[in-house]
């Protein structure tokens, strides 16, 4: 019975490994969609000087406007108020 169990386990494991290998290496779409493959292609393009980077050109005029998310603005206001309150509380001890 134990030989049959070992044979069944070995057969199941080797079948799973074979199917995984087939779908991951031979039938490539699963591999080509992974982050590992995409990173590998990007690194190869950088090494071969084929990479295309998107550049953002900054304007040189003095009227450049910086946009920030509303959440960041609220955080800054909150932090300023907390600092002012803490300074006011500590000023009592001076």
UniProtKB/Swiss-Prot annotation:
Keywords: Membrane, Mitochondrion, Mitochondrion inner membrane, Transmembrane, Transmembrane helix
One CC-aspect GO term: MICOS complex
Chief location bin: mitochondrion
Segments traversing the membrane: 4-26
Intracellular or extracellular location(s): Mitochondrion inner membrane
Domain of life: Eukaryota
InterPro entries linked to this entry: Mic12
GO BP term, example: cristae formation
Xref: Pfam families: AIM5
Membrane-topology descriptor: Single-pass membrane protein
Subunit structure: Component of the mitochondrial contact site and cristae organizing system (MICOS) complex.
Homology family: Belongs to the MICOS complex subunit Mic12 family.
Functional summary from the UniProt entry: Component of the MICOS complex, a large protein complex of the mitochondrial inner membrane that plays crucial roles in the maintenance of crista junctions, inner membrane architecture, and formation of contact sites to the outer membrane.
Protein name per Swiss-Prot or TrEMBL: MICOS complex subunit MIC12
Native organism: Kluyveromyces lactis (strain ATCC 8585 / CBS 2359 / DSM 70799 / NBRC 1267 / NRRL Y-1140 / WM37) (Yeast)
């Amino acid at each position: 019975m134990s030989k049959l169990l070992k044979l069944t386990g070995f057969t199941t494991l080797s079948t799973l490994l074979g199917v995984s290998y087939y779908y991951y290496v031979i039938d490539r779409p699963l591999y080509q969609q992974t982050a590992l493959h995409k990173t590998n292609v990007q690194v190869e393009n950088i090494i071969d000087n084929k990479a295309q980077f998107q550049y953002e050109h900054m304007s040189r005029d003095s009227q450049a406007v910086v946009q920030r998310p509303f959440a960041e603005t609220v955080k800054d206001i909150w932090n300023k108020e907390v600092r002012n309150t803490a300074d006011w509380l500590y000023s009592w001890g001076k």
